[in-house]
Design a protein with these regions (language model features):
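Intrinsic-disorder/low-complexity signal
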Residues: 1-231
Length: 231
C-alpha cells in the first residue's frame, strides 16, 4: 500500500428484502489482541495514532448503496487492519442483486468522486453462505503496509451481526492465516521417496523449454505437476 489514506468500500443492492450490510475495520496489535474498531456503532476514532472515519450507516439499498471507511496510515502503530462486511438484516450475500468490496489508495491532495476509478486497487464480489465476510487483512512490516487477500467468511448469526460480536473469532482466524507456513514446491519434492541428492536439479514451469540447463534431471510442468503430491 503506497498512499496516505487507505479507503475500504462496500456496495450492495438488495433483491428481495430490506438489506443492511455494515462495513467495519477491526484493528489488532502485533500479538493479535483487540486494538479497536470503526463501524456504524463507532463512526470515527483515533486508533493507534491514526484518524479513522466511517461514511455513515445505510440500512437499505433498493437502488444500491455504499459505505466507506478512510484510514490515515501515517502514524498508525497497530500491526493489522481487518476489513469486515457484516450482514445485519435482509438478503444473504448469495441472494443480493449486487454485493462487492474493494479498497482504494488515496492521497491528501486527491479530490473527486468516492469511486474515482484510478484510485481503486482491488474490487471483488462478496458472495457466499456466511453472515460475516472477511475480504482482506492489511499488515505492517519494516517495509510498509501490505494486503493479504482472503475472500473468507464466518458463519455468524442469522441476523444482527456486528464487529463487536465476532472479534474473538476473527482474531483467531487471522492469527492462523498469518502464522501459517504454506507448502512450497521444494517441500513437496522433499516428501517424495528416495535419497536426496543435493547435486540434482529440477525444472518447474508452465511448459518445458526448448533447452535445459546442464544438470537438470527432472522436468515438472502443468502436465505432471500433480506427481509431486505423495500418494
Amino acid at each position: 500500500v503506497v498512499a496516505d489514506t487507505l479507503r475500504f468500500f462496500i456496495h450492495w443492492k438488495q433483491k428481495q428484502d430490506r438489506t443492511d450490510y455494515d462495513l467495519s475495520a477491526f484493528f489488532m496489535n502485533k500479538d493479535y489482541t483487540n486494538a479497536g474498531h470503526v463501524s456504524w456503532t463507532r463512526l470515527s476514532d483515533d486508533v493507534g495514532g491514526a484518524t479513522v472515519v466511517h461514511s455513515g450507516d445505510i440500512t437499505s439499498a433498493p437502488n444500491g448503496a455504499s459505505e466507506f471507511i478512510d484510514i490515515k496510515l501515517n502514524g498508525l502503530t497497530h500491526s493489522y487492519i481487518v476489513a469486515q462486511v457484516n450482514r445485519y438484516v435482509g438478503d444473504d450475500f448469495s441472494q443480493a442483486e449486487e454485493s462487492f468490496f474493494g479498497f482504494m489508495e488515496r492521497n491528501e491532495k486527491q479530490k473527486g468522486l468516492p469511486f474515482e476509478p484510478k484510485t481503486v486497487k482491488v474490487k471483488s464480489e462478496v458472495r457466499g453462505k456466511g453472515q460475516v465476510a472477511v475480504p482482506a487483512v492489511f499488515f505492517r512490516n519494516k517495509n510498509g503496509w501490505f494486503c493479504k487477500w482472503l475472500d473468507m467468511q464466518l458463519t455468524g448469526q442469522p441476523i444482527c451481526n456486528t464487529v463487536e460480536g465476532n472479534k474473538a473469532t476473527t482474531s483467531m482466524m487471522i492469527k492462523s492465516i498469518m502464522e501459517r507456513k504454506n507448502l512450497t514446491i521444494k517441500d513437496l519434492m522433499d516428501l517424495l521417496p528416495g535419497t536426496q541428492d543435493e547435486t540434482k536439479m529440477a525444472y518447474v514451469g508452465f511448459q518445458q523449454p526448448e533447452t535445459l540447463s546442464k544438470g537438470i534431471t527432472k522436468v515438472m510442468t502443468l502436465d505432471n505437476l500433480t506427481g509431486l503430491i505423495p500418494q
